[in-house]
């Protein structure tokens, strides 16, 4: 019997050879069948899916879209089981639970038509409208950021206001171990010393020793024998689940690197100094919302036998752990730095006094698509329910960073009824010290500056100066004022500090630097223009 032909709950039980157990009827003595009990039995016993969890999800989300990858085999099996169960319940006319749509990233395609977005792969086609952005959860699982078409779809949904776990631009950083390490370094998060390693660096007489000194300050360039006892961990940048990780030392590591690059010369690696761990590492699941953070769960992962890795997916055991205040602070700070709504932070406690510079704990990784193996058993309750219980108000997520083009239109409200639209360039990585705007001729007098907009004269206080370099490295002093209001897309920032410049022969009137973009909640696509706003001609300033 195929589930697509099922028309009743009784047929479900016949198909799966389930004898209905009606606990509620036995207590009440009314002899009536209870659909919820039947459904719960079917889900739990046959598909290992908890009906109560799905029911809780349905109170918040009517649609769940999952983008996944063939590499995520274990989780895909669970997801497909849930999809099958939901399809069967719909055919059997049972109680409504969320529509779940699972798309494999490598095969997915989309079509955008006004407010509708059609998503399809070899197995499914689903049409969703922008009106669904308040009742739809989008989950981007492992490997999605590797597929350009799928990445585009997720960004499209993200820009339309859909809740995405996790935004692909941040998940991509977390899935690259070197970029993660750089992010942690910028954020002042304690972590083992590290360096990037490629085949070109390995065989470069100057770059290789410089790289190794980033890992070991006392790395001896002349006497290699002095480096033999230095222990290090080598990781492939996009490895996951403990794969592509090697523990070695200064005596053997060169041969290990040569072997890896012989197999694939394009491989990129990160080398980390091996720190002295105090037992296994700790995985902390953190939910970061607009105005609050929640530690959902934590578990200590105990290594299996002689394996130095502590991944539960590799057979390591998990046990309950009480986080120290320092570990809580590190987990929360790291999660906020990642800009991902839900992530797992892997923290390794160090042997007391083993590294005075790092302290008692280091962060090993940030997981954008964390596995949940063992976590429910450790915390004594279903982890999915713990997560869902924190998602009571979807509006808490709607300030996720949106994608903007590198060229957009912005509107500035100067006050006194004057609003003007400008063509803006959005900083894609040059790191401009200040945003700036063309205002035409201006007059500086004392600590004030005056210029004209739309025929009206405006005077602003000078609050500072910035130094800008031109293409020929000449330095120019620029006056900084506070702009009353600037709007980009649907978002606005008030009292924005901007430098003013006279008219230049450029294609844009305004430059928005990265700090301002962050305040507005936008990240920039370096390949697209006018994602948020319609195209416009440059406005000439007279």
What do the predicted segments below correspond to?
Residues 232, 294, 343, 362-365:
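Protein kinase-like catalytic core scaffold
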Residues 398-542:
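Pepsin/retropepsin-fold aspartyl endopeptidases
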């Amino acid at each position: 019997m195929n589930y697509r032909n099922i028309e009743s709950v009784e047929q479900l039980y016949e198909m799966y050879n389930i004898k209905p157990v009606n606990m509620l009827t036995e207590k009440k003595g009314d002899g009536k069948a209870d659909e919820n009990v039947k459904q719960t039995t079917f889900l739990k016993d046959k598909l290992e899916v908890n009906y109560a969890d799905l029911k809780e999800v349905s109170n918040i989300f009517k649609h769940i879209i999952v983008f996944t990858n063939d590499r995520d085999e274990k989780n895909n099996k669970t997801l497909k089981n849930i999809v099958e169960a939901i399809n069967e319940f719909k055919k059997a006319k049972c109680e409504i639970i969320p529509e779940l749509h699972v798309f494999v990233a490598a095969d997915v395609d989309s079509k955008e038509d006004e407010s509708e977005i059609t998503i399809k792969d070899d197995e499914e086609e689903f049409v969703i409208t922008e009106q669904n952005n308040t009742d739809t959860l989008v989950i981007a699982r492992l490997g999605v950021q590797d597929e350009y078409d799928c990445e585009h779809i997720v960004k499209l949904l993200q820009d339309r206001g859909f809740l995405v776990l996790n935004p692909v631009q941040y998940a991509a950083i977390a899935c690259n171990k070197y970029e993660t390490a750089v992010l942690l370094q910028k954020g002042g998060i304690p972590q083992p010393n590290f360096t990037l390693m490629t085949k070109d660096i390995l065989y470069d007489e100057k770059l290789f020793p410089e790289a190794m000194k980033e890992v070991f300050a006392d790395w001896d360039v002349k006497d290699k024998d002095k480096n033999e006892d230095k222990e290090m961990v080598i990781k492939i940048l996009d490895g996951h689940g403990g794969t592509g990780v090697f523990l070695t030392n200064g005596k053997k590591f060169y041969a290990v690197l040569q072997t890896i690059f012989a197999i694939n010369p394009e491989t990129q690696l990160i080398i980390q100094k091996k720190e002295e761990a105090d037992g296994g590492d700790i995985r902390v699941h953190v939910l970061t919302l607009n105005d609050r953070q929640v530690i959902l769960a934590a578990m200590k992962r105990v290594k299996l036998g002689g394996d130095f890795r502590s991944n539960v997916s590799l057979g390591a055991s998990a046990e309950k752990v009480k986080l120290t205040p320092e570990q809580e602070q590190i987990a929360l700070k790291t999660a906020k730095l990642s800009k991902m709504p839900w992530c797992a932070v892997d923290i390794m406690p160090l042997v007391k006094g083993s590294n005075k510079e790092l302290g008692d704990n280091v962060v090993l990784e940030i997981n954008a698509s964390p596995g949940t193996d063992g976590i429910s058993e450790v915390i004594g309750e279903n982890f999915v329910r713990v997560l869902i219980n924190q998602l009571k108000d979807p509006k808490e997520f709607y300030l996720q960073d949106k994608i903007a083009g590198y060229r957009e239109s912005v509107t500035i409200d100067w006050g006194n009824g004057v609003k003007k639209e400008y063509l803006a360039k959005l900083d894609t990585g040059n790191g401009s010290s200040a945003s700036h705007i063309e205002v035409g001729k201006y007059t500086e007098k004392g600590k004030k500056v005056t210029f004209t907009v739309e025929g009206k004269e405006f005077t602003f206080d000078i609050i500072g100066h910035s130094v800008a370099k031109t293409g020929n490295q000449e330095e120019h002093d620029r006056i900084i004022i506070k702009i009353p209001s600037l709007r980009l897309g649907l978002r606005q920032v008030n009292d924005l500090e901007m430098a003013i410049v006279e008219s230049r022969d450029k294609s844009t009137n305004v430059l928005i630097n990265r700090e301002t973009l962050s305040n507005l909640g936008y990240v920039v696509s370096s390949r697209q223009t006018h994602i948020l706003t319609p195209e416009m001609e440059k406005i000439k300033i007279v």
